[in-house]
Design a protein with these regions (language model features):
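Charged, amphipathic alpha-helical segments
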Residues: 2-7, 87-120
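Solvent-exposed edge beta-strands and adjacent loop segments
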Residues: 2-94, 147-163
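Short, surface-exposed beta-strand/loop "edge" segments at domain boundaries and coil↔beta transitions
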Residues: 29-32, 89-92, 130, 136-144, ...
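N-terminal start-of-chain detector that recognizes signal peptides
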Residues: 50-57, 101-107, 113-117, 136-143
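Acidic surface patches and DE-rich sequence motifs
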Residues: 63, 135, 173
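Beta-strand secondary-structure signal
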Residues: 79-83, 130-132, 165-169
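Phosphate/anion-contacting hairpin/loop surfaces
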Residues: 116-138
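Mixed-charge, glycine-accented linear interaction segment located at domain edges/termini
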Residues: 138-184
């Protein structure tokens, strides 16, 4: 027996997420070969990320004698979620619809300190773009070239600072790709 793909050739791993970058546009394969400016380096909580692209829904078709005749499969539902631990204005603006600035005479003074910012709607906001995930050892990258995200603000959970619970749904880009997997 001749083995053409040995274990050493197959040892390209994605061994945990080190960085999550958000770009505010859909990516194509040709975009990856150019210098890109990431819109945002998201501060994702450790152990706060789930990357499951969905188990396929397989239906087995049987004939009258009980034998499997054929199968049909559909794409499964993805479970891609992460927690972004920041209430910086740029992050708030990304995940919530901005309403009115709270500055100047409208700002609040508590114990001599002045606070200002913005008001937001908590209604779900669709955020479209792409996600680039760098592995811990930077040997591989997973790119979701076209995602739609929704987030909810969690102001306190007892263990973590305030964060956004983000759910991302990968969609095919113009080229038909839902995911791009890259290695060094």
């Amino acid at each position: 027996m001749t083995i053409t793909h040995t274990l050493s050739k197959l040892r390209t791993l994605f061994n945990d997420v080190k960085k999550v970058y958000y770009l505010n546009k859909e990516l194509k394969a040709a975009d990856l070969g150019t210098e890109m400016t990431a819109f945002m380096d998201l501060p994702v909580l450790e152990d706060g990320i789930t990357l499951n692209t969905g188990e396929p829904d397989v239906t087995r078709i049987k004939i009258i004698n009980g034998d499997n005749w054929c199968t049909r499969a559909k794409k499964g539902d993805p479970d891609i979620s992460f927690q972004v631990a920041s209430i910086a204005g740029e992050v708030n603006d990304l995940f919530m619809e901005k309403k009115v600035a709270v500055t100047g005479a409208a700002s609040i003074i508590i114990e001599g300190a002045t606070y200002s910012g913005n008001s937001y709607s908590l209604a779900p906001k669709s955020v479209k773009g792409s996600l680039i995930l760098m592995s811990e050892d930077q040997s591989s990258v997973i790119v979701f070239p076209n995602v739609e995200m929704y987030a909810s603000l969690v102001a306190a959970d007892g263990d973590n600072p305030a964060y956004f619970n983000v759910t991302a749904t990968p969609m095919a880009n113009e080229e038909g790709a839902d995911v791009m997997i890259l290695g060094k």
